[in-house]
Structure formats: C-alpha cells, structure tokens
C-alpha cells in the first residue's frame, strides 16, 4: 500500500530551496510526496520545472503569507483538508508560520483520519526581544496549536527552550536540528583563480572591498541598515573602494532602489536580483553582511562562513548559534548603523594574517551544521513516523 505525505508551505520556491534532502529521504522510505503551496507567488520564480524534477505531486492552494488575510487562508485551509482526504494523506510536514497554522488546523479537522502532523518552526515569532504584541498573540497561538502537533522541530537553542514549555499532542516529541544542513560540496572556499575570475565577471576590481548580502528584499532582512552604514562611511570623507552587492529579490525592491538613490549610493550598490550561483558570488566577497532583525538560524550567514568569508551580522537568536564577535566576523544590534559602519571599517583594516586566522575560524564554526547531521535527524524522525503509520495500518 502506498504511503502519502503532504509538505505544506506558503510559497512554491521553499521546497527546492530547503527541502530537497527531505524529499529524497521520504521517497527512499516509499512515500508519494505531495507539495501544497501558493504556486502563483513569489512572482519572480518563473515556473514549476524544478519541482517536477523532484518527483513530487504539486497542488496549488490560495495560502497567503500574512495570517491576517483571513479570506484567502480560510479557503486554503479547506483546500488542505480536501487534499488530505482525497489522497488519503497519512502524514503532513508543515513549514512557515502560516503553513504551520493551516497545517495543524487541518490536522485538527482530520483527527479521525489519524494524520501525523509535523511542524518545523523556522523561528518562533515570540523570541527574546520581540514586540509585546508578538509575545501576546504568537505565543498563545503556538500554545493552542501545539496540542495538534505530533512532532515539533526547532532550529536554535532559544526556540528549543521555548518549545519545552509547550504541551504537544499526547506522545508528541520535540527535536532540534541544525537547519536544513550545509551542502559542503556546494559551499566551500574558492581557489585564488576562481576568485579572480569571478570578481572580473562581476565587474569588481582587484582593489575593491566587496561586500555581499544574500536574502529576500523585505523588511525583516533589514538591508536598509547596511545602506545607512555605507552612507555614514561616505559622509566621513574617508571613502575607500567599497562595492556592495545584494543577491535576492522581493517586494522591497522598489524601496531599495529609492533608498539607494536617496543616499547617493548608486555608484557602489548593485541589486543582482535572484541568482542560482550564490556560491560563486559569495566566494568573491571580502565579507558578507547579514543584518536581519529576526532569524531562526540564518543559512545565508552559515553559507558565507562555509566559504571562508567572514560575516558582519546582526545579533539575533539565529546568528548566536554560530557567530563570535571578532572571531569569525563582527556582531551588532540590527538597528545600529554606526556599528555596521564600524564593522565594515574593521573588516577592511584586517592584516593578511588576521584575515587568514578569521577564515579558519569561519570554517570551524560551521562544522556542527553540516548536512549529514541534519539529514540523520530527519531520517530518524521520518522513520519513526513511518513505523507509526505502518502500526496504525496493521492494527487499524
């Protein structure tokens, strides 16, 4: 008898970006993998070709990123329930805040069907230092949804401690994993020749100090603070040869273009848009900047470190898992433009020996986050779910 599992997220690009190894594991265990997301968003991902190549069954649902778009999400909830019942889904693995909300509400509605519900929290919204409204609303929502959760997966220590205070469904389990795991074959230091050729292709001069950020252009990713830091450096009168490139796209692109113009940075800032050659760009950087206000873990920061490129990061629960100030980069408050400006200056002033030492510390910092560790935990989780499904079929 075929086993069916549903992976539920908000946007279609999530699966091939972050869940490829999980899909392979599930298929190896004999599952037919269904994937439900809003296939019309984001608009800058062109087609479903990569999803089809993964061998999953694709389902469009009208899920919205915002939990406050009630009409769309109510419709999406009913679509998820219909999928579960039509395809006899035996387990579902939901991701993203709204995916986790709808997936677990669907699990509640389908309780008699015995669906095993897994939720990966890629960063609770009731984190330390979060706005009071987050603490009041999101914690209560998570506390309520926990009772319909069989397996809760978190990706940082702060969230793990918070998860232990929640009451899951009877027999529920909590796991901490190192994110989706680093692909060491893809993210590794470039050779000197690869770096020279890459910088030449990007139009970066040999004397330029090249900064890179990777991430969607939105409010949380906080790229504005880097622009403010660069403007401060420029106003100081001591203007070094700095180039800043942003890899990513999103709803803030027009705002970013406006801010770049207003701050007089058009000659040094480049919006590269969405790219699928991130290692080639990151490896050419002298440093990366990761200014997010909130991160569950922050793979962009880890990927930079894995390439031996130090990071100027915002302090948040995700970066605390792997960043050490003045060891593998520099860490500042997410709203501290002067701090980020200082970090850029300090990074530029490193001697060759200091830069070599920092590179070694970068590579050491990412060892606990290698993909093998994350895959081993997920394999154990999915195997336990499979055993549970098979026992239910046997005695059901």
Predicted feature locations:
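A conserved mid-protein helix/loop that constitutes part of the nucleotide-sugar donor-binding site
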Residues: 16-21, 209-234, 251-257, 338
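A short, well-ordered alpha-helix in the C-terminal region of glycosyltransferases
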Residues: 197-200, 346, 353-368, 380
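Nucleotide-activated donor-binding/catalytic signature segment of Leloir-type glycosyltransferases, i.e.
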Residues: 257-273
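Aromatic "clamp/platform" in nucleotide-sugar-dependent glycosyltransferases that forms part
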Residues: 274, 293
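Short hydrophobic beta-strand element within catalytic cores of glycosyltransferases
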Residues: 310-313, 323
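Conserved acidic donor-binding segment of nucleotide-sugar-dependent glycosyltransferases
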Residues: 325-326, 330-337, 346-352
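N-terminal strand-loop element at the rim of the active site
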Residues: 6-72, 158-167, 174
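Donor nucleotide-sugar binding/catalytic pocket of nucleotide-sugar-dependent glycosyltransferases
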Residues: 59, 146-195
């Amino acid at each position: 008898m075929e086993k069916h599992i549903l992976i539920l997220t908000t946007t279609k690009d999530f699966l091939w970006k972050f869940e490829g190894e999980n899909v392979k594991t599930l298929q190896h265990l004999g599952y037919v993998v269904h994937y439900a997301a809003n296939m019309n968003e984001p608009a800058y991902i062109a087609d479903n070709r990569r999803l089809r190549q993964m061998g999953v069954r694709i389902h469009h649902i009208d899920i919205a990123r915002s939990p406050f778009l009630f009409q769309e999400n109510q419709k999406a909830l009913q679509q998820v329930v219909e999928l579960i019942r039509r395809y006899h889904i035996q387990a579902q693995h939901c991701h993203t805040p709204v995916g986790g909300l709808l997936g677990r509400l669907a699990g509640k509605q389908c309780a008699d069907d015995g669906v095993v519900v897994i939720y990966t929290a890629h960063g609770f919204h009731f984190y330390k230092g979060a706005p009071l409204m987050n603490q009041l609303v999101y914690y209560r929502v998570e506390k309520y949804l926990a009772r319909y959760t069989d397996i809760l997966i978190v990706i940082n220590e702060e969230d793990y401690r918070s998860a232990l205070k929640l009451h899951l469904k009877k027999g529920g389990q909590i796991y901490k994993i190192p994110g989706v795991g680093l692909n060491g074959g893809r993210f590794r230091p470039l050779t000197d020749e690869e770096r020279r050729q890459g910088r030449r292709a990007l139009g970066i001069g040999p004397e330029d100090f090249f900064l890179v950020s990777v991430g969607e252009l939105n409010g949380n990713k906080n790229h504005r603070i880097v622009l403010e830091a660069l403007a401060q450096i420029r106003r100081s009168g001591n203007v070094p040869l700095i180039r800043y490139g942003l890899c990513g796209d999103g709803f803030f692109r027009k705002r970013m273009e406006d801010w770049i113009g207003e701050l007089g940075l058009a000659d040094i800032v480049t919006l590269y848009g969405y790219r699928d050659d991130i290692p080639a760009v990151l490896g050419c950087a002298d440093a990366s900047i990761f200014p997010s206000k909130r991160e569950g873990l922050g793979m962009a920061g880890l990927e930079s470190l894995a390439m031996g490129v130090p990071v100027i990061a915002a302090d948040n629960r995700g970066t605390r898992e792997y960043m050490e100030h003045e060891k593998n980069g520099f860490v500042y408050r997410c709203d501290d433009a002067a701090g980020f400006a200082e970090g850029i200056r300090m990074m530029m002033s490193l001697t060759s020996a200091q830069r070599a030492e920092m590179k070694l510390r970068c590579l050491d910092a990412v060892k606990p986050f290698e993909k093998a560790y994350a895959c081993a935990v997920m394999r154990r989780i999915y195997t336990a779910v499979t055993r549970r499904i098979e026992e239910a079929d046997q005695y059901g």
